[in-house]
A protein has these predicted regions:
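Conserved N-terminal catalytic/coupling substructures associated with nucleotide/phosphate chemistry
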Residues: 2-209
Length: 209
């Protein structure tokens, strides 16, 4: 049976945008950077966001990418327009602080800037946020957990989050206590039968030495 994370990722593994395509757009001639990034399709590994996006909203997507396969968010592009970031320079530090301020444990990201020509024809820049895939499940400081699924960052229900933890080896299904059940609910006879082979094996081991 495929796990929840496996089903989601396999369903969207048809080739859309690759990391190489994003890299090629980011390293294109200055006047082409914005247009090439706008032409790319948002997918499992790539997203575009406005420089007007609030840090807490960007945090949802950062957590989602981290809980999946990682990816890149380019900030300064919105609705087919190359906004750039030069008119909002005060937001750069806020973006850099997102992992510490809004994610638990802090997501590992790399924040950089790339030059471009904005839609007004002026020299400008974009912010790139590169998110590494995580080995454990990340969440927002309010406890919400997100997963990147295709071109969406989906909020997970409790059971979906538990499945994600199983997939990442962060939790074991047979190690979860059942609510309302304690040792007094165990069938003594079944418990004895379960333990009998263990005792027998132990006896054979010591008898053979």
């Amino acid at each position: 049976m495929l796990s929840l994370l496996g089903i989601y990722l396999k369903a969207f593994r048809v080739v859309f945008v690759t990391a190489n395509e994003v890299d090629r757009a980011l390293t294109a001639p200055l006047k082409e950077v914005g247009a090439k990034l706008l032409a790319l399709r948002e997918d499992q590994w790539f997203d575009r966001k406005s420089i007007r996006s609030q840090p807490k909203d960007l945090a949802q997507h950062i957590v989602a990418f981290s809980n999946a396969e990682g990816g890149t968010i380019v900030v300064g592009l919105h609705d087919g327009v190359v906004e750039g970031i030069d008119q909002h320079g005060e937001k750069i530090n806020s973006i850099r602080q997102i992992p510490i301020d809004f994610t638990v444990p802090p997501v590992r990201v790399h924040v950089d800037q790339v030059g471009c020509i904005n839609s007004k024809g002026e020299p400008d820049a974009l912010v790139t946020i590169t998110i590494d895939p995580s080995e454990s499940v990340h969440e927002l400081t309010n406890g919400d957990c997100y997963l990147r699924v295709g071109d969406e960052s989906r909020k997970l229900r409790h059971d979906q989050r538990r499945e994600l933890e199983f997939d990442k080896g962060q939790a074991q299904y047979d190690g979860i206590a059942l609510a309302g059940v304690d040792v007094n609910d165990l069938d003594p006879e079944l418990t004895r039968q379960y333990r009998e082979p263990e005792r027998s094996n132990g006896f054979q081991y010591f008898a053979g030495r």
